[in-house]
Each structure stands twice: as structure tokens, then as C-alpha cells.
Amino acid sequence: MSSSGMPDLPAPLTNIKIQHTKLFINNEWHESVSGKTFPVFNPATEEKICEVEEADKEDVDKAVKAAREAFQMGSPWRTMDASERGQLIYKLADLIERDRLLLATLESINAGKVFASAYLMDLDYCIKALRYCAGWADKIQGRTIPVDGEFFSYTRHEPIGVCGLIFPWNAPMILLACKIGPALCCGNTVIVKPAEQTPLTALHVASLIKEAGFPPGVVNIVPGYGPTAGAAISSHMDVDKVAFTGSTEVGKMIQEAAAKSNLKRVTLELGAKNPCIVFADADLDSAVEFAHQGVFTNQGQSCIAASKLFVEEAIYDEFVQRSVERAKKYVFGNPLTPGVNHGPQINKAQHNKIMELIESGKKEGAKLECGGGPWGNKGYFIQPTVFSNVTDDMRIAKEEIFGPVQQIMKFKSLDEVIKRANNTYYGLVAGVFTKDLDKAVTVSSALQAGTVWVNCYLAASAQSPAGGFKMSGHGREMGEYGIHEYTEVKTVTMKISEKNS
């Protein structure tokens, strides 16, 4: 254990044999009904890792049936003490911690994450999130209500039922924990669809679900494509809730499918273009580093990236200079290699989309300060890119890039920057850097975002709720608010012969 409290960084595993490639339904491994499989690739080498069974509508039906049976009244899961549910989630967290090295290595191979980041950050958050949710299992309580008349009234927080959980490829272990932790601690059963690009860690966790002792059907994991498996979950008449993290475009489709089917409950965490505002009185060293990490962590593949950076005019030139110097310090290569701190984008499609947006920045008049091109002959690498002289009407200032591209815009006044920062369809997170407390309070109150970080960035924790305003989605994940997204409140009122205070 290091002095910072983080575990020491071991070497990644070598020559991993992929053990789990089938669908996990009812605590058993299944081939797909259609017999189809799909390839999974290493984005650093472009090599195929393995083939994984491809879930389709028929497989989703099987998973939903198993989940529904596990949720029936009188089932082992429904009759289990809440404290025991919590113990199962604690056990799962312990098993993930036991297999932390394997999971971090898989995450690096399959998702292109720098190994140190996967091991120290992603797996750390995953384990903490599950333990946080485990602690909530026997603390979800209703209330007694002093209603008028000779009645006794109280509320129950009941599990919603069968929940479909769909998440993307950029942080598979974090997103898995943020979905299954709250759902399971409240007593729901789940159908998990990991991204087709990165299913391997979720499938390993499936084996740990069984090892931990969860009853059959409580957790089902069905890798597949969005238009087939994802659509089947979203439109299924026997799924009671769907929680989705991904693009706004797909989020709209999921909400529409939910409405047109059984009006299932929906939680959405969608796209973003997050403002990060640096005032002239900020600690410049700290602001440069936080803003830098905010956009370049995980090669910019983050919904909470600091992708719309506003810097006050008086410090603009120095801020740009320091940001460029910082962006030039990366070491590229296979993310499993010691010393490498910049990995690939997830696939060719994402790589090409990012490069197209970089080219748009050049054509629309932004000044390319560094980067701006691909790197290497193999893998989907893009150089960390910094643009200055960016204006609000440019595509790189308006569109979610989801890549290692920092665009730095200039502002003159507080009122101006608040208006510009809010001039977006999105509202997920924001950052503010200033030593002036009044300014910090004013700006954080005015920004239309679900999370505002002051003099920090990427300071996410399992104890705090996360979610978006506007087209960044609705509902919250993690924290107490995120737990209650997975319950229905029932009021029970009974007639009594006499009521006394």
C-alpha cells in the first residue's frame, strides 16, 4: 500500500486466456439462440481477442424470464433479509478486489485503458461503489404518516422489479458497478447489456456473481448490439425499468421505446459538452493541471470531460502556453507497457470521428497549438491536441468530441461566461476555478449542470449523486438519490378503531 492510501501498482498479467465468452442467464452459461457470435478487438493492436456469443431478442426473452422468476413473491431473492442482500454485494466487491489484477488487465486489453488507470482508478471506484451500495441494503426505510381520521398510514420502498441496465465502452467496470450496485441493494433483478466493444470484464464479473452466491436469475448478462439486444430490453413488456448511459441520440430512442411499450421507468445519463471556467484569480498551476486531466484522462473518452474550456482574458496566453507544454508530455504505446500514459481510442469509427472534428477546427479558424494527428502505424491512437482562438460557433466548441482534444476559449466578464457556458443543449458537469468565494458560489449556482466542481475536476465519488440537466439525461446514479431511483414508494393506509397520539 502506498503512502497515498492507494494499492501499489503490480505488473499486468501476461498471456491471459479468455475464459468467459457466453451469455450468463439464470446463473448458467448459454450459447446464443441464433448461434451467432461477434468479434472483440484490442484497440491498441487492432487484433481480435476472441469471439463472444451475440445476444438477440430471443436471448433477452430468456434473460427476462429468468429475472422475472427470480423476482416472484416467495422466491429466495424476495424473501432474503435486506442485510443478507448487502452481504452478497459485499462478497461480490471482495471477489472483484481479489481479481483486481485480472480485471484491470482485461480492461486495458479490451478497452485500451492505460493499465495504471484501470487498476488504480477504475477498479478502485468499482469496488468502493459496490461497498457503498451494500451498506445501503438494510437502511432503505419508509415512514409513518400522521394522516387525519382513524387511520394508520405508512410508506414502503419496494424494488421496481426487472431492470435493464445498458452501458457503453469507455468505463466498463465503473459503469457496471454504478448500475448493478443500486439495483441489487434495493432488491431488483437485472438484465445487463455491456457494450459490444467491451464485454469481457462484465462476463468475468458474471462468474463472480455466481461465486458470491446470488440466487439464479438475479443477475443476467447478455452481450450484444444496441439495435438488437439493447432495443429488445428497452421495448420489452416485462422489463420494469431501463437505465442507460450513452449518447443522447440513443437515449431518445430508449425513452421512446420505453414509452411505447409498458411505460417502464427510465434513467438516462447521456451526452455532454462540459464547461470549465478559469478566472484570472485562480491558482494557475492547479487550474492547468485539473483542466488538463479533465479532458485528456482516458484519451478524452469520458462523458464528464472538461470539453469546453473558458479562460479569462488576463491569463489566457499563459494558460494556453502551459496547457500545450503539459499536453506534449505523453508517452504513447500499448497501455499495458510500463511508462505508457496515453492509449488508443476504442475503435476506428471513433478515431475517424475525432479526426474529422479536429480537421473541422483547423478549417474553421482555430489555432492548432499541438497534436492534431494520428500516432503510429498500428492501433487507434490520436495525439493530444490543443486548440486556441476557439469561438463558440465552431463545431469543436459545440459538439461532444469524446477524444483527446482541448479547445480553449477566451472570456472577459462573469456574466458573459455564464451565458456562454449555459448556451448548450447539455448539462452534465461543470468546473469553476477561482479564489473568490462569492464568485464560486454565484457561478456554481448559475451553471445548468448536475454537478459543479469548484477548484477541482473529476472529483466523482460513490457517495455523491451524478446526473444531467437538459439533454444530458434525467435521474441520478449513486449517492442516496441514486439508490432511490431503484425503488417504488407504496403508501399503505389501514382503518383502525381508535387513533392516539
UniProtKB/Swiss-Prot annotation:
Q: Which Pfam families match?
A: Aldedh
Which InterPro entries would you find in this protein's record? Answer: Ald_DH/histidinol_DH (IPR016161), Ald_DH_C (IPR016163), Ald_DH_CS_CYS (IPR016160), Ald_DH_N (IPR016162), Aldehyde_DH_dom (IPR015590)
GO BP: ethanol catabolic process; retinal metabolic process
The record's listing under CDD domains reads: ALDH_F1AB_F2_RALDH1
The compartments listed are:
Cytoplasm
Active site: which residues?
Answer: 269, 303
Key words of the record: Cytoplasm, NAD, Oxidoreductase
Q: Where is this site: Transition state stabilizer?
A: 170
Q: Does the keyword Transcription apply?
A: no
User: Is Transferase among the key words of this record?
Assistant: no
GO cellular component terms?
A: cytoplasm; protein-containing complex
Name the family the entry cites.
Answer: Belongs to the aldehyde dehydrogenase family.
For this entry, the protein name equals Aldehyde dehydrogenase, cytosolic 1
Species source reads: Elephantulus edwardii
- Which gene carries the instructions for this protein? ALDH1
